């Protein structure tokens, strides 16, 4: 990795992040889980920023690189449904009676 934090801040696409950190990736995995990988990566970056505010830019980029690898690995080993990163996975259906709620008299 030879980029700067300013270059990092200009990145948008998942592929750009992987290229910035010189990380190999399976395009099929990224195509299927793109938003989920980026969301998880964002969560990890937020944790790094909150827990280690005094890191140098180089140290921060190194931590971000590890965070991207970790986020990518999560979706190799599990599914988006299992991770439930987005609101749609956590919303409870309205006006639905589940089978476990039905009892016989």
Curated annotation (Swiss-Prot):
The keyword Nucleus belongs to this UniProt entry's keyword annotation: no
Q: Which UniProt keywords apply?
A: Nitrogen fixation
> Does the UniProt entry include the keyword Repressor?
no
One GO biological process term: nitrogen fixation
Do you know which InterPro entries this protein is assigned to? NifW
Q: Which family does it belong to?
A: Belongs to the NifW family.
Any idea what job this protein has? May protect the nitrogenase Fe-Mo protein from oxidative damage.
Assembly: Homotrimer; associates with NifD.
Protein's name in the database: Nitrogenase-stabilizing/protective protein NifW
User: Gene symbol?
Assistant: nifW
């Amino acid at each position: 990795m030879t980029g700067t934090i300013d270059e990092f801040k200009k990145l948008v696409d998942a592929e750009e992040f992987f290229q910035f950190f010189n990380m190999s990736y399976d395009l099929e995995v990224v195509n299927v889980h793109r938003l989920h990988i980026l969301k998880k990566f964002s969560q990890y970056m937020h944790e790094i920023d909150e827990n280690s505010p005094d890191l140098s830019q180089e140290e921060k980029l190194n931590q971000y690189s590890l965070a991207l690898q970790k986020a990518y690995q999560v979706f190799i080993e599990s599914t988006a449904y299992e991770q439930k990163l987005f609101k749609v996975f956590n919303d409870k259906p309205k006006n639905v009676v589940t089978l476990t709620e039905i009892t016989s008299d």
